[in-house]
Amino acid sequence: MSGKKSGLPDGRIPDRLPDGRPAVAWRSRWTEGTLPLWLVATAGGMAVLFVVGLFFYGSYTGVGSA
């Protein structure tokens, strides 16, 4: 490979600055944007567990309980 840096014609932002430091600080790497991804994933996981719990509850009570 050549030592020449690519100009990244597809619009990507390089992950390192010319002096070798990361382009985005580690503190803010996972919390950029409107809502942190970990918060969205936690809420989604809790919603899935709630719905699965409703199915189990419904299988022991009501119409399908035998």
UniProtKB/Swiss-Prot annotation:
Keywords: Membrane, Photosynthesis, Photosystem II, Reaction center, Thylakoid, Transmembrane, Transmembrane helix. The chain crosses the membrane at residues 37-57. One of its GO terms (cellular component) is photosystem II reaction center. The keyword Membrane applies. It comes from the Bacteria. It is a single-pass membrane protein. The keyword Transmembrane helix applies. It is found in: Cellular thylakoid membrane. One of its GO terms (biological process) is photosynthesis. InterPro entries: PSII_PsbJ (IPR002682), PSII_PsbJ_sf (IPR037267). Pfam families: PsbJ (PF01788). PSII is composed of 1 copy each of membrane proteins PsbA, PsbB, PsbC, PsbD, PsbE, PsbF, PsbH, PsbI, PsbJ, PsbK, PsbL, PsbM, PsbT, PsbX, PsbY, PsbZ, Psb30/Ycf12, peripheral proteins PsbO, CyanoQ (PsbQ), PsbU, PsbV and a large number of cofactors. It forms dimeric complexes. Belongs to the PsbJ family. One of the components of the core complex of photosystem II (PSII). PSII is a light-driven water:plastoquinone oxidoreductase that uses light energy to abstract electrons from H(2)O, generating O(2) and a proton gradient subsequently used for ATP formation. It consists of a core antenna complex that captures photons, and an electron transfer chain that converts photonic excitation into a charge separation. This is Photosystem II reaction center protein J. It comes from Synechococcus sp. (strain WH7803). The gene is psbJ.
